[in-house]
């Protein structure tokens, strides 16, 4: 009577998914292209069982974030805005000044902007670790180099 067919939808639970760790070297790569590759892994779009409303992606470690490149004149002209939440408290930084002050911030801002807004995006962003140098402190996770 209740015949099982191949048309049944398979639902994957996030707790049953084994998350892998990946290392991406951002040295001499373009900022946006690195961010796109990272977001695909964080969201889990490289897996056959991708589900948009669940955290089924993997963890990502980025090294050499301070050596990321931009095209054109964006190095001097690209602006990042922040606000102190006081009247008249709008501040702007160029890519150059922001990367001198916080070397990992431009890459983190680009990735955060590509993730979904809300609780899912905040949880996905926690799966990202960014290091400005060529060494990272997560060797115990045995990350796969991409």
Swiss-Prot record:
UniProt source species: Borreliella burgdorferi (strain ATCC 35210 / DSM 4680 / CIP 102532 / B31)
InterPro entries: Ribosomal_uL13, Ribosomal_uL13_bac-type, Ribosomal_uL13_CS, Ribosomal_uL13_sf
Record-level Gene Ontology MF annotations: mRNA binding; structural constituent of ribosome
GO cellular component, one term: cytosolic large ribosomal subunit
Subunit structure: Part of the 50S ribosomal subunit.
One Pfam family matching this protein: Ribosomal_L13
Keywords: Ribonucleoprotein, Ribosomal protein
Keyword Ribosomal protein (UniProt): yes
PANTHER family assigned to the protein according to its UniProt record, in alphabetical order: LARGE RIBOSOMAL SUBUNIT PROTEIN UL13M (PTHR11545:SF2), RIBOSOMAL PROTEIN L13 (PTHR11545)
An example Gene Ontology biological process: negative regulation of translation
CDD domains in the record: Ribosomal_L13 (cd00392)
Source lineage: Bacteria, Pseudomonadati, Spirochaetota, Spirochaetia, Spirochaetales
Protein name: Large ribosomal subunit protein uL13
Protein purpose: This protein is one of the early assembly proteins of the 50S ribosomal subunit, although it is not seen to bind rRNA by itself. It is important during the early stages of 50S assembly.
Family recorded in the similarity comment: Belongs to the universal ribosomal protein uL13 family.
